[in-house]
């Protein structure tokens, strides 16, 4: 069973402002995106901040940690559905915790929450996927993170720091118990597979 989630460009970029085009995604191409949703009570704070800054709804898929991204081919599609794929990603569930507001500038205009806990686990899963499918679409090193927005103003970044940097650890923690595989073309996310972590 597949589901397609349509999002506006604003929601898709997780951006409270009109975002520039992604430096990684090429128009007209389809990608495999393996992500972990930020779930539980603590995601509400993130979604509320995005909603307040952006106005309007924030799609649930917008708050996640990208684990791996690569251009989708027919052979890759078959590999994702295979039992080998499940075996390679046989990983225990883990706790993750976001830290302070950081930026990828000047490489790209993305502000994000770094990961204080769970970073090593995300990096290990990413490396398993690199070993299976190759380096992927990103032209820069993998940094597990939760995107706050793209093209934010300095005022918005300062506000994000006020809201997120001082939160106690229990309000920044979430459980990673599933990985979600999506086919993504820059606008629509079509769920291909959900992998429960044990």
Describe the function of each predicted region.
Residues 2-95, 103, 118-172, 189-198:
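Basic, often amphipathic N-terminal segments
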Residues 110-118:
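Short histidine-centered catalytic/ligand-binding loop motif
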